[in-house]
């Protein structure tokens, strides 16, 4: 370089120093900006999601000798049908057919696991393995689905059958045994520990983040009671100063654990059941002779959130990712491993 006719020479160490300073000026600001990029809904939770379950048995042909005895509550009779036909009727009844295919696969896997575990545990009632109501899993026949879906029947059924066939014969296991694969509609942002809701601890039914549920139309709701009805249902007295009850503790899943009333304490589960609330995540306020209860989520909150599963699927997660997130430490095995122990009817 010539400056004013004089030649200026740069030493090699000086050149390296200048180059490093230029690099720092460019790189450091970029590094500072990147961590503050706005994350997508569910991205943080998804990053913590366990990898897809390994060693998954391929969907296979299921022995049609494995039949499920279903007590049809309305007809007051037992109907016996092949396993995969039963699972199809459950998935169609329990999850919206418009949901992502990977969410429907996760639902099929949970539904099949639920009934296999129930059949292995025995204890029939009304000579049936399960009922067709929410006491177990809702099941509807093809005739009932035709009435429900109308012109959408063919397309909906085809999609459901695809989800079932892609998981045919697969069940979720923990420590070599089919799990109690509970599921529900919508969380409050976290699922619930089984021990906190039912009192029984299951190592695979632990509280996990489920931020995708915020997109559910069932995420929040309000119910209004008269003070008289509220008191009658709960067997408590509401104080004259407007204090409805003191919520003492919350569970790990951010739901009400205990509520103290005057001379009486109820669990969040008891309050939910007595008031028929959508969730045990609730708050309330008194407005004159009314009590307004606001809830977050829909269902008991234990196991797989259906709207959470759909949110994960919409982000590109596979059904194996979904079940690995909601059921901790599980494996996927073939139902054929338990065929000899199942109640087989010919």
What role is predicted for each listed range?
Residues 1-346:
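Conserved, single-site charged/polar hotspot
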